[in-house]
A protein has these predicted regions:
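Metalloprotease/metallohydrolase-associated module, dominated by Zn2+-dependent proteases
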Residues: 1-48, 64-99
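Active-site recognition of the HExxH zinc-binding catalytic motif
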Residues: 51-63
Length: 99
């Protein structure tokens, strides 16, 4: 499940699902560091959306760690593996809210 907001190194990023990201920005996701926003293409499958979220989250982690020049290939590779590790092992942290 993708949260509405996420903190990276104490900085809050709002997560927004946007129509036609691919057509507007030629990306499936996008992080706006100065605005504190992660945008995801609303029309993606849930698995792909989660994978793209992890990808953008890693960009945020690198940026907040002071690494402004990021190798997109490394982010892609690590995000795919990290997403699969989290999913396959059903890993989550913090309190699970039940309704």
């Amino acid at each position: 499940m993708i949260p509405d907001k996420v903190k990276v190194a104490g900085i809050e990023y709002r997560v927004q699902e946007v129509e036609d990201m691919d057509r507007q920005f030629d990306h499936l996701g996008l992080i706006l560091y100065t605005k504190g926003v992660i945008k995801l293409d609303k029309n993606l499958s849930q698995d792909r959306k989660e994978q793209v979220f992890i990808h953008e989250l890693l960009h945020g982690c690198f940026y907040e760690a002071g690494i402004e020049e990021q190798d997109e290939d490394i982010i892609n590779r690590v995000s795919i593996v990290l997403y699969q590790v989290l999913k396959d092992n059903k890993l989550h942290f913090g309190k699970i809210e039940t309704s």
